[in-house]
Amino acid sequence: MPRAKTGIVRRRRHKKVLKRAKGFWGSRSKQYRNAFQTLLNAATYEYRDRRNKKRDFRRLWIQRINAGARLHGMNYSTFINGLKRANIDLNRKVLADIAAREPEAFKALVDASRNARQ
């Protein structure tokens, strides 16, 4: 009887890869080699997109702040500059949330920004 050297080890490794590839289309979820190659590509996309997510959200927050500021006759850059002069230290995530959910509070921030610029 021949000696089995990698039987259980290989099976476990393949099962782990195929488990991670669940939900992929066609042979990419059934065959080890295709699944492994697809997972390598998926890992590069994951790595890249974890970094891109930070940029995307910052861009979204800036758009929301700009839209809220323009409703009150001011653009984004002058609004942020006025907040800095007024020593109001709120990050863009919080400002975007206030602009979307609490228009009265955002109007008060716009007024404070406008007063600090004059």
Swiss-Prot record:
Transmembrane segments: none annotated. This is Large ribosomal subunit protein bL20. Keywords: Ribonucleoprotein, Ribosomal protein, RNA-binding, rRNA-binding. Part of the 50S ribosomal subunit. Contacts proteins L13 and L21. PANTHER family: 39S RIBOSOMAL PROTEIN L20. GO terms for molecular function: rRNA binding; structural constituent of ribosome. It comes from Deinococcus radiodurans (strain ATCC 13939 / DSM 20539 / JCM 16871 / CCUG 27074 / LMG 4051 / NBRC 15346 / NCIMB 9279 / VKM B-1422 / R1). One of its GO terms (cellular component) is cytosolic large ribosomal subunit. The lineage of its organism: Bacteria, Thermotogati, Deinococcota, Deinococci, Deinococcales. One of its GO terms (biological process) is ribosomal large subunit assembly. It holds the Pfam family Ribosomal_L20. InterPro entries: Ribosomal_bL20, RIBOSOMAL_L20_CS, Ribosomal_protein_bL20_C. Binds directly to 23S rRNA, probably serving to organize its structure. Belongs to the bacterial ribosomal protein bL20 family.
